Amino acid sequence: AEFNQRSILWDLNYFKYCFLKATGMEFQENRLEDDFLKMSDVLLRSSSATFLYRDFQSRNVMVKDGEPWFIDFQGGRKGPVYYDVASFLWQAKAKYPEDLRNELLSDYITALRKYIPVDEAYFHSQLRHFVLFRTLQVLGAYGFRGYFEKKPHFIQSVPFAIENLRQLLKNDYPEYPYLCSVLRELTGLKQFTDDIQKHMLEVKVMSFAYKKGIPNDPSGNGGCLLYTSPS
């Protein structure tokens, strides 16, 4: 497998169909697709014959005897060196402080120079596009696993990814004007503007009859059924 235009557009459309459309937002698909194509061109400006882990995040790094071991790399492929940095340092729920993120990024560039020449200014300019791309891919995954498969962990992760996106959009991406306007509207939707810390326990009480089937449990954790006998 290889990081190429097909895989890029697949991920961007994953975001469009599994997350963006699920919000009910209206947008012009042809203009959005134009910016998707522009993004694929930007991401493919520099390629390297390196291993791209793809799902590189802290939960996939296990420590055994003081040494890191890596799991869940079946999505790995040949690709550019920027993607995994974006995946790890901008993972939605980690909320790394800016100082720590910059320190880790500096360490990465220093280590990378042992293998290939690195123009640090160009590296940073290219990395920001991969961070945006990875954030959209993650939202697509959260949309599919959360909104469609009803898995609560992914639904709970959405506000963190939206906040990442909100922070990214503070710096302009002139290459993708329409995409950015759509994303700014997305981050301003009411369901994404609530304080992450204010989410409270929700209890739903309803009646059902077995002849109509087993009631749906949207929480994904089994719920609780209370039986009462008629008086």
Sequence positions of predicted segments:
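Active-site activation/catalytic loop segments of kinase-like enzymes and analogous catalytic loops
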Residues: 13-22, 81-117, 129-149, 161-170
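Extended, well-ordered alpha-helical scaffold segments
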Residues: 28-39, 104, 154-164
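Conserved small/polar residues in nucleotide/adenosyl-binding loops
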Residues: 227-231
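ATP/Mg2+ or Mg2+-diphosphate-binding catalytic cores
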Residues: 140-217
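N-terminal low-complexity segments that are often proline-rich with Ser/Thr-Pro
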Residues: 214-226
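ATP-dependent phospho-/nucleotidyl transfer catalytic cores
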Residues: 1-53, 64
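Active-site acidic catalytic loop and adjacent metal/ATP-binding pocket
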Residues: 39-85, 92-96
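All-alpha amphipathic helical-bundle segments outside canonical DNA-binding/catalytic cores
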Residues: 2-3, 119-131
